[in-house]
Amino acid sequence: TQSTGTSQTVEVGLWGGPDN
């Protein structure tokens, strides 16, 4: 999925989360 954060490494649920 497309990440809303800066990095697209980690996805949370149905949305892409930032690589924290």
From Swiss-Prot:
It comes from Morus nigra (Black mulberry). Keywords: IgA-binding protein, Lectin, Mannose-binding. Belongs to the jacalin lectin family. Two isoforms exist, a major form and a minor form. This is the minor form. GO terms for molecular function: D-mannose binding; IgA binding. Transmembrane segments: none annotated. It comes from the Eukaryota. Tetramer of four alpha chains associated with two or four beta chains. This is Agglutinin beta-2 chain isoform 2. Residues 1-20 are annotated as: Disordered. Residues 1-10 have a biased composition (Polar residues). Alpha-methyl-D-mannoside and D-mannose specific lectin. Binds IgA.
